[in-house]
């Protein structure tokens, strides 16, 4: 089986790219069409557009993730394949509602589907995928393995042909999840120490800045850091009805959060990757 390193832009998956040789390194980028979220460096925008094969306007993650992946490619000395799917706007338009913890179609459409389509083009037979779960994340690994079929492979529903004028859908087995950091007992402290004084820049926190898995207080802090991006998330609420907000269980809108007063200064260290949403593969 071919071996693929799945990269999210964080220190953990980047550690895998730097320390575990694979046939491919693949990174899936979340994009937006919104010019208010324009990536500021025109030259880098063009580089990213060339890598993706489609115009790159901006991302709804921290812009630093772009520099992370460019730095990482130089540091490891191996090509990183960049992939992308629909823009977040198009994903929401197709769904007609917002995602939530039980229907994380944002992750499926913007992370998994682009990687699956890349796999179809380049490999198209079951392959091993190194996933960035650390030694203390065995429960996450267990949940992933519980989704595999009898052959130990994850499946994807995809178009496999045509039936008259209609698409013919089928189930394709494609990914054998592998957890090298769990196998080698690698914890966060080892990874943090490894990246000290290395020429790779990292974002403070990965995944979309307005991910609904983040604590509302963290969303307020993210608004202070990335006002245009959080306002993008706020603008997408109430697609379906008045209670169609990112925090459905709380009936709490991003506009409510944005209006909160800053009673105390929230420091970066008040939050960790448990607050990030874990959308990275």
Please state what every model-predicted region is:
Residues 1-281:
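Nucleotide-activated chemistry modules centered on ATP-dependent adenylation/adenylyltransferase
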């Amino acid at each position: 089986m071919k071996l693929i390193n799945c990269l999210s832009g964080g220190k953990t998956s980047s550690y895998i790219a730097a320390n575990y040789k694979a046939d491919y390194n693949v990174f899936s980028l979340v994009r937006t069409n919104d010019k208010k979220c324009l990536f500021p460096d025109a030259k880098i925008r063009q580089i990213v557009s060339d890598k993706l094969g489609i115009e790159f306007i901006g991302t709804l993650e921290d812009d630093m993730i772009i520099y992370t992946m460019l730095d990482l490619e130089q540091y490891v000395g191996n090509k990183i394949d960049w992939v992308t799917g629909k823009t977040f706007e198009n994903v929401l338009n197709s769904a007609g509602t917002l995602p939530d913890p039980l229907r994380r179609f944002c992750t499926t459409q913007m992370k998994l589907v682009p990687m699956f389509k890349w796999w179809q083009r380049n490999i198209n037979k079951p392959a091993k995928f190194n996933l960035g779960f650390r030694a203390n994340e065995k429960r996450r690994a267990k949940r992933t393995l519980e989704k595999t079929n009898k052959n130990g492979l994850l499946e994807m529903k995809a178009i496999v042909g045509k039936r008259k004028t209609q698409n013919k859908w089928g189930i394709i087995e494609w990914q054998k999840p592998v957890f090298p950091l769990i196998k080698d007992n690698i914890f966060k402290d080892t990874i943090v120490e490894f990246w000290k004084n290395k020429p790779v820049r990292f974002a403070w926190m990965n995944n979309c800045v307005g991910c609904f898995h983040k604590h509302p207080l963290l969303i307020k802090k993210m608004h202070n850091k990335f006002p245009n991006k959080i306002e993008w998330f706020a603008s997408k609420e109430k697609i379906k009805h008045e209670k169609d907000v990112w925090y459905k269980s709380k009936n709490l809108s991003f506009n409510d959060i944005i209006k909160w007063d800053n009673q105390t200064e929230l420091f970066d260290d008040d939050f960790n990757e448990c607050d990030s949403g874990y959308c990275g593969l």
